[in-house]
Curated annotation (Swiss-Prot):
Gene3D superfamilies: MatP, N-terminal domain, Met repressor-like. The gene is matP. GO terms for cellular component: cytoplasm. GO terms for molecular function: sequence-specific DNA binding. It comes from Escherichia fergusonii (strain ATCC 35469 / DSM 13698 / CCUG 18766 / IAM 14443 / JCM 21226 / LMG 7866 / NBRC 102419 / NCTC 12128 / CDC 0568-73). InterPro entries: Arc_rbn_hlx_hlx (IPR013321), MatP (IPR009390), MatP_C (IPR035375), MatP_N (IPR035087), MatP_N_sf (IPR038339). GO terms for biological process: cell division; regulation of DNA-templated transcription. The keyword DNA-binding applies. It is found in: Cytoplasm. Pfam families: MatP, MatP_C. Its main location: cytoplasm. This is Macrodomain Ter protein. Keywords: Cell cycle, Cell division, Cytoplasm, DNA-binding. Required for spatial organization of the terminus region of the chromosome (Ter macrodomain) during the cell cycle. Prevents early segregation of duplicated Ter macrodomains during cell division. Binds specifically to matS, which is a 13 bp signature motif repeated within the Ter macrodomain.
């Protein structure tokens, strides 16, 4: 396992995930009967700061259809949590207009690179072009100065 599992922290994430799903109207319990489901949800809502009891609740009451989705969500959250500790792994987001994203995604696909790798490559290409233009401008000025001195 690449990232250490922190039971207390992850129980809090699981609790938040389940409460969010419940508020969005998803069935988070394994019970078909509404009163049993509501009773289990009410119990869950009281367990926010009790990680061991949250895990027990999950084992006893959670809808089996949510198991894999919750695992994926927690795995992604764990990765983001640990990556945020180091500057070089910390992720940043930018807002792009759809057309810009579409062009960038197409270019990345054609180059066989990720969006981040494509952006870095475009920046490097622009920097190289700028450096080349500056060098040519400098050479042109030097050449004009040499030709001007010889007259």
């Amino acid at each position: 396992m690449k990232y250490q599992q922190l039971e207390n922290l992850e129980s809090g994430w699981k609790w938040k995930y389940l409460v969010k799903k419940h508020r969005e109207g998803e069935l988070i319990t394994r019970y078909i009967e509404a009163s049993a489901a509501q009773e289990a949800v009410d119990l869950l809502l009281t367990l926010e700061n009790e990680p061991v009891k949250v895990n027990d609740w999950i084992a006893k009451h959670m809808n089996p259809a949510l198991v894999n989705r919750m695992k994926q969500t927690i795995r992604a959250r764990r990765k983001r949590h640990f990556n945020a500790e180091h500057q070089h792994t910390r992720k940043k987001s930018i807002d792009l207009e759809f057309m810009v994203w579409q062009r960038l995604a197409g270019l990345a696909h054609r180059r066989g690179k990720t969006l981040s790798e494509t952006i870095v490559q475009l920046i490097e290409d622009a920097e190289h072009k700028e450096k080349y233009a500056n060098t040519m401008s400098s050479l042109k000025q030097d050449l004009q100065a040499l030709l001007g001195k010889n007259d």
